[in-house]
Design a protein with these regions (language model features):
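Glycine/small-residue-rich loop that forms an oxyanion/phosphate-binding "nest" at active or ligand-binding sites
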Residues: 1-47
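Catalytic cores of alpha/beta
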Residues: 6-16, 49-58, 80-81, 95-111
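Generic structural signal for well-ordered alpha-helices
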Residues: 10, 31, 51, 73-77, ...
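C-terminal helical cap(s) of enzyme catalytic domains, especially alpha/beta-barrels
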Residues: 34-39, 122-150
Length: 150
C-alpha cells in the first residue's frame, strides 16, 4: 500500500490485503505498527535525522521523495559517501522516462518509481494497454542497458 501516513491507513491497508507499506515520510507510530505486524515498510527519509531514525528501527532500505527537488543523485552520493553508506534507496518524485536513467547506474539505488510507463503517450487515459506494455519494455531495456554500460 502506498502513501501510508497514519496507523489508520496501515490498518486499512492490511484489511485490504496489502503485503507491504510505502510512506512519503517517516512516522514512528506507523513504523512501529508495521514492525509489530511483520509488515515490510519503505519509509520516506530525506534528512540525516530521518535516516538515523530509520536505521535505529533496523530499516536500511529507504524511499527518497522527491528526489530531483531535493538534490538528486548528488544528495544520495553525499549520504552514501558519509555516515549512511549502508543505506539502499528507492527514488521517486519528478522522474520520467529519461531522467530516471542516472539512478539506474547507481548500485545503492534499488529502484525508481514514477508514472511515466502509464502516463507517456496517454496510455492510461486512452486505456491503451498495449502502449503501457511498450512503455514498460522500453523502461526495462533502458535500465538493463544502463546497468550493462557500468
Amino acid at each position: 500500500a502506498g502513501s501510508v501516513i497514519s496507523v489508520r491507513d496501515a490498518e486499512e491497508a492490511i484489511d485490504a490485503g496489502a503485503k507491504f507499506f510505502v510512506a512519503p515520510g517517516l512516522v514512528p507510530e506507523v513504523v512501529e505498527f508495521a514492525l509489530k505486524n511483520n509488515m515490510p515498510i519503505l519509509p520516506g527519509c530525506v534528512t540525516a535525522s530521518d535516516i538515523s531514525i530509520a536505521l535505529n528501527y533496523g530499516i536500511s532500505i529507504l524511499k527518497f521523495f522527491p528526489i530531483y527537488q531535493l538534490g538528486g543523485a548528488d544528495t544520495l552520493a553525499q549520504y552514501h559517501g558519509g555516515p549512511f553508506g549502508n543505506v539502499e534507496w528507492v527514488v521517486t518524485g519528478g522522474l520520467n522516462g529519461k531522467n530516471f536513467l542516472p539512478f539506474a547506474e547507481i548500485d545503492y539505488v534499488l529502484a525508481s518509481g514514477g508514472d511515466w510507463m502509464f502516463a507517456e503517450n496517454n496510455a492510461v487515459t486512452d486505456k491503451n494497454y498495449e502502449q503501457i506494455v511498450i512503455n514498460t519494455r522500453s523502461t526495462i531495456n533502458d535500465v538493463l542497458e544502463a546497468r550493462r554500460v557500468k
